């Protein structure tokens, strides 16, 4: 599969700066949802970049450094569990994506606006040409790169959250609803970073 096929078509149409955008943590019971947007140089193909869920943590970390080194610009958007409970997870994910696009920054600290955005199966409320690509992290290198950046940054946050809330095993399951996590919730109750709207069936 040519992971630049979609990007190549857009470059041929005259779009120069093409961003990939993806989110991580949508299905978690705990913590923020996080999105990343990445703009890579025209024509650059990075070996091994694919959907972050198909990579080992070690390989994700390695590729994160390669992406960071080569990216024209990167941006991250984070939406808290509290806001997720207020506006629902889909809207929170879209807001995180929008924030990640608006926070795109070059290595020199300058803001960057892309000509076009490729988004993993979602539309962003922003006045920039875009396409929602189903299974985008498999079909577009830009979206796959964004998925890796988002996953690495959120996993690092999970390690920090685990130190603050040691009863739940967050570093191990990253906030997802594993048996260990559900049992800890029943034993200790939810922390302030748990998504109350996700816990109704567990804590009924």
Swiss-Prot record:
Named cofactor requirement(s): Mn(2+); Mg(2+)
Catalytic activity: Endonucleolytic cleavage to 5'-phosphomonoester
One Pfam family cited in the UniProt record for this chain: RNase_HII
GO molecular function, one term: RNA binding
Keywords: Cytoplasm, Endonuclease, Hydrolase, Manganese, Metal-binding, Nuclease
CDD domains: RNase_HII_bacteria_HII_like
Cofactor note: Manganese or magnesium. Binds 1 divalent metal ion per monomer in the absence of substrate. May bind a second metal ion after substrate binding.
SUPFAM superfamilies found in the cross-reference section: Ribonuclease H-like
Binding residues for a divalent metal cation: 22-23, 120
Enzyme Commission identifier(s): 3.1.26.4
Compartments where found: Cytoplasm
Any GO CC annotation of this UniProt entry: ribonuclease H2 complex
Keyword Hydrolase on entry: yes
Example GO biological process: DNA replication, removal of RNA primer
PROSITE patterns: RNASE_H_2
Highest taxon above the source species: Bacteria
Family to which the UniProt record says this protein belongs: Belongs to the RNase HII family.
Function in brief: Endonuclease that specifically degrades the RNA of RNA-DNA hybrids.
Record PANTHER family: RIBONUCLEASE H2 SUBUNIT A, RIBONUCLEASE HII
Protein name: Ribonuclease HII
Natural source organism: Alkaliphilus metalliredigens (strain QYMF)
Taxonomy of the source species: Bacteria, Bacillati, Bacillota, Clostridia, Peptostreptococcales
């Amino acid at each position: 599969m040519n992971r630049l096929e979609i990007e190549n078509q857009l470059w041929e149409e005259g779009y120069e700066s093409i961003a990939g955008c993806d989110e991580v943590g949508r299905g978690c019971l705990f913590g923020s949802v996080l999105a990343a947007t990445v703009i890579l140089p025209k024509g650059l193909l990075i070996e091994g970049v694919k959907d972050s869920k198909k990579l080992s943590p070690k390989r994700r970390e390695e590729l994160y450094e390669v992406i960071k080194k080569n990216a024209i610009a990167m941006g991250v958007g984070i939406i808290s569990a509290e806001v997720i409970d207020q506006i629902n997870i889909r809207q929170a994910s879209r807001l995180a994506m929008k924030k990640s696009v608006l926070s795109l920054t070059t290595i020199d600290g300058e803001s960057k606006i892309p000509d076009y955005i490729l988004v993993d199966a979602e539309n962003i409320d922003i006045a920039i040409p875009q396409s929602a690509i189903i299974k985008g992290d498999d079909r577009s290198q830009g979206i796959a790169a964004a998925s890796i950046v988002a996953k690495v940054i959120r996993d690092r946050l999970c390690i920090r959250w685990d130190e603050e809330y040691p009863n739940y095993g967050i570093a191990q399951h990253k906030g997802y609803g594993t048996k260990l996590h559900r049992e800890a919730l029943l034993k200790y109750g939810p922390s302030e970073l748990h998504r109350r709207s996700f816990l109704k069936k567990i804590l009924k």
